Amino acid sequence: ESETMAVYGSTYALGPTRVQFQNKDPRGWKEFETQLRDHSSLGSANTMRGVQRRRPSLYDLQDELKKIIVPTLILNGDEDDPCLDVSLFLKRTIISSALALLPRTGHTCNLEEPHLFNQLCETFIHQVESGRWELRDKRSMTTSIISASDPDGM
């Protein structure tokens, strides 16, 4: 809160999960940075303090997440390292979910790869609306590559 968004926005925009956007689309990234810098400093501080800091870890919500059966699409950039493990956790926990990793992409996948992002979302929506989005087959929920009943893969 001590820094204004005019200062912090530039730092945030150059974070390790956003440089991919800058490398792919310098002009689009510059607009992104400008918009971040225009955010309310108080509003941004309140979001970090009131939401990011207070909410429990998603790992602590595993029991509640296991109850989710609504269609869920998890999108993640493969270079968004802080979110990769969480995305895999969500995929393994929510039986109605699918995970798509966007290659060479950071945290801003909708901005970095808008066509691929929109295509994945459109396909997801069509599958849900047509009744073709089903729960994951429980036989596939193992780390074994040989048999669903063979937990050691032997």
PLM regions: where:
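Active-site phosphate/pyrophosphate- and oxyanion-stabilizing loops and adjacent acidic/basic residues
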Residues: Q62, L88-F89, H115
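Conserved alpha/beta-hydrolase "acid-adjacent" motif
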Residues: D81-V86
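Conserved Class I S-adenosyl-L-methionine
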Residues: L42-S44, I68, G106, M141
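Short beta-strand/loop motif that positions the catalytic acidic residue
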Residues: I68, I74-N76
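Conserved alpha/beta-hydrolase catalytic His-Asp/Glu region
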Residues: S2-L65
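Catalytic active-site module of serine/aspartate enzymes centered on a nucleophile-bearing elbow/loop
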Residues: S97-M154
